[in-house]
A protein has these predicted regions:
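Post-Walker A helix-loop "phosphate-sensing" segment adjacent to the P-loop in P-loop NTPases
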Residues: 30-38
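ATP-dependent small-molecule kinase phosphotransfer cores
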Residues: 42-98, 104-108
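ATP-binding Walker
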Residues: 19
Length: 204
């Protein structure tokens, strides 16, 4: 858990549609009470099992554009037709690290805004499995557009801090949890070192 002095980490998750980002993030939140999800906005309809205010904040296109005008949405993308996705300007619950789902463009904007950003790209196990997952949640007419978007996301994967293949959900969650632990240790160790240096300087 962070303190007022330790800057929280924002863990950004990116991956093509059907890569399992939501499942991995839900498992992390279940297992780690010190993580908080940054809930983003979308104008698409909720999928089965999705909860408004947890998975997304589901709003109309008109409401979404009003939030943009009011400055409450920091960055947004029009992904498919009238399917807008946007991120809130206010990110963190004090004392907690955050996790958020963004595409590569949103990731770049947040890296420019925050120092403590760790980016994690989730890969599907195979192209065939990616197609199956996309078809299971959208009409076949949308397959081409969603595959084009997946290719665009995959092209930017090498620029992420970590790339994790989601071929087994439990193993993928364990790998990502290890990343969270390592990055927290790195952050906390640097903070403790800075504190020691400041104390030594004060004693001189």
């Amino acid at each position: 858990m962070t303190t007022d002095k330790v800057e929280p980490i924002l863990f950004i998750f990116t991956g093509p549609s059907g890569a399992g980002k939501g499942s991995v993030m839900r498992a992390l939140l279940r297992d780690d009470p010190t993580l908080r999800k940054v809930v983003t906005y979308t104008t698409r309809s909720p999928r089965e099992g999705e909860v408004d205010g947890f998975d997304y904040r589901f709003v109309s296109v008109q409401q979404f554009l009003q939030l943009v005008e009011q400055g409450k949405i920091f960055e947004y993308e029009n992904v498919y037709r009238d399917h807008y996705y946007g991120s809130p300007r206010e990110l963190f619950v004090p004392g907690n690290d955050g996790i958020i789902e963004l595409d590569y463009k949103g990731r770049i904007k947040y890296q420019e805004r925050w120092r403590q950003v760790i980016s994690i790209f989730l890969m599907p196990p195979s192209l065939d499995e990616l197609k199956k997952r996309i078809l299971s949640r959208s009409h076949v007419a949308n397959l081409s557009a969603r595959l084009d978007n997946a290719v665009e996301q995959l092209r930017h994967a090498k620029s992420y801090d970590y790339v994790v293949k989601n071929d087994d959900l439990d193993q993928c969650v364990a790998r990502v949890a290890d990343i969270v632990r390592v990055e927290r240790l790195r952050r906390d160790g640097r903070y403790q070192l800075d504190e020691m240096i400041h104390e030594l300087q004060d004693e001189r």
